[in-house]
Amino acid sequence: MDKSDTDWDGFDPEAREEREIGREMVSKSTGLGSVVAHFYRGEMSVVTTWRSRLDETINWAVTIISAILIYAFSTEGNHVILLTGMVVIAVFLGIEARRYQAYDVYRARARMLQENLFANTLDPSQGVEHRDWRRELSEDYRNPTIKTPYVEALSRRLRRIYFPFFALMLAAWLFKLMAFSTQPVLETAAVGNVPGFVVFGVVGLFYALITAVAFWPRERQSKGEFSKVEHGEWKEAE
């Protein structure tokens, strides 16, 4: 058997001296600290890149929503443009949920390092947050996996960003139907040969669906960055 295989068989990433590698980085002068610094810098660079991609999606959504609203109320055009706006927002939501899944992969790695390496380096007395953090991180680099289910990604982006967009578009659509026509609302809501009550039914089902996705209770899988609010208490001198 190769000597390296023998050494690896004896390696236990959950052993105290291995999982608390942050203590070694402070107490001993090794090249490990330099390697980890570059490694962490690279991870944060990827996190920042994916964060900017999320922001780009939001910026495009805001721009298109603004254009649709301006066009819808600057002419006597059909209310269908606002229904189209709802579809456009849904498309952007789907794109952003996919991007959020990728973003969370790299954010989870960065948080794993922050919680178990850097926090332990600053205060070794607290120990690590995850006993097998090195094994988990190693496995994730060998076999990268999505950490957040797609439905949860949709839910988080809906609550944070897109639900207000949908609410704004719904309010604009209803206002357009009621304020810019002398006909009954159900007649005004008709789209071509599709009766108004069918249009209302489809819109109602769609909003019921996104409300359920956004607010249905579920166990969180994504890696959060903030555990609680302290409002500056942490930096007060004793």
Which residues does each predicted region cover?
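Membrane interfacial helix-start motif at the N-side
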Residues: G42-E56, Y103, R142-Y162
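Transmembrane helix-loop junctions and nearby membrane-interface residues
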Residues: I70, S74, L93-Y100, L174-S181, ...
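A hydrophobic membrane-anchoring alpha-helix module
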Residues: T145-E238
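Solvent-exposed, non-transmembrane helices and loops of integral membrane proteins
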Residues: W8, P13-L32, R111-T148, K228-A237
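Cytosolic-side membrane-entry/anchor segment at the start of a transmembrane helix
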Residues: G22-T75, T211-E219
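Inner-leaflet juxtamembrane helices
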Residues: I89-S138, A212-K228
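Hydrophobic core segments of alpha-helical transmembrane domains in multi-pass membrane proteins
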Residues: I81-I89
